[in-house]
Amino acid sequence: MIEPISTNDAPGAVGPYSQAIKVGDLLFVSGQLPIDPATGEFNSANAVEQAEQCLKNLQAIARAAGTDLSKTVKTTVLLTDLGDFADINRVYTGFFSTPYPARACYEVKALPKGAKVEIEAVISLT
């Protein structure tokens, strides 16, 4: 069964998609932009602070589904400047510990709303 997951503790979708979808024992979390759910705005123009907000948003959605980031199986990180990679890794280790989730990281030309970072995740519910 497919179950949408939604929380006001993370920003609403900026397009026709769900914050997350629960299928079986997995939670597929849509890419999170660095939007502060309280204001609906970017928290910062700084890539490091944007990454932190993206991960806070992922954390809020995981909690809404009854899980947490420690059960993350895979993430995909999108950056508009791969030069931010090392700094983003430092933020990342504040939210994840070993064994780290599988991950892909790509440099992209642009992200929605002019963001510098977007992060999506697949999280176990067991």
Swiss-Prot record:
One of its GO terms (molecular function) is deaminase activity. Keywords: Plasmid. GO terms for cellular component: cytosol. Pfam families: Ribonuc_L-PSP (PF01042). The keyword Disulfide bond does not apply. It comes from the Bacteria. Belongs to the RutC family. This is RutC family protein y4sK. It comes from Sinorhizobium fredii (strain NBRC 101917 / NGR234). The lineage of its organism: Bacteria, Pseudomonadati, Pseudomonadota, Alphaproteobacteria, Hyphomicrobiales.
